[in-house]
Amino acid sequence: MPRALKTNSPTDLGTAHCRNHAYGMWVDYRTVQEALRQRTGLVVCNMRGNHADSRHIHRLWSASGEYCVVGGVRVTTPACTAAVCANSMPFMPAMEVMCWALRNGTSSTEIIACATREGLMNANARNVFRFATPFAENGGEARALAAMILCGFAPPAQQVEFVDPQTGKRYRVDFLWRTRDGRIVVVELDGLVKYRDPQMMDGRTLGGVIDDERERSDGLKRAGVDVIVRIRMDDLYVLEGLKQRLARVGVPLRRR
């Protein structure tokens, strides 16, 4: 698709999803499926073009026209790509893109400047800019962070390290909160791939992987963690159920 657009219109700088994949940004498959179902693309163009919108293509005019070339295709810069996605995508997938950009060296200042310059500031973009962090290590963690924000919980600390006093092993947790009564609550995102992908299993049997997870939980408890909640990707699509689970263990709500 981006190559076709490049051929037909030299002013087009690529569609949102094509830009994301060109950079390797995090976009979950359900978001891509929905975009394909709608059969509509958002294309960023510079101001020299005179092409109107069509049934399947909506053009967003760019004042700067800044772009990079990836694989022979012109695409918007990472900062402007994140800004466009924050403006036009739902909160959860927009958070995935924004967290990717921050983790890979694009500054929030640069992204916000692009959004301001291009007139992309709206309520969704402001929320994305407020809550996105560079600490998510993959798209699943970015989506989990977004889900917990949508549930109304306070932003968690991320990638906090604990040392097991018994074994000396170090463990980093995905998400952490400290409750008012002093307890430490940890949420870990479990991907089924770790139980299926031979590379992630690292030569271990399924039983060995499960034993390692149990050892990790025991080590975290010895290091001072009071509650460990394990969630899966499917939980991120049933927000009411996720909210109830985390509320039961005392995860603090966000102050409005």
Model regions: which residues?
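Short gly/ser-rich loop at a beta-strand->alpha-helix junction or flexible surface loop bordering the NTP-binding
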Residues: 1-121, 128, 254-256
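Surface segments flanking catalytic/ligand-binding clefts of nucleic-acid enzymes
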Residues: 102-256
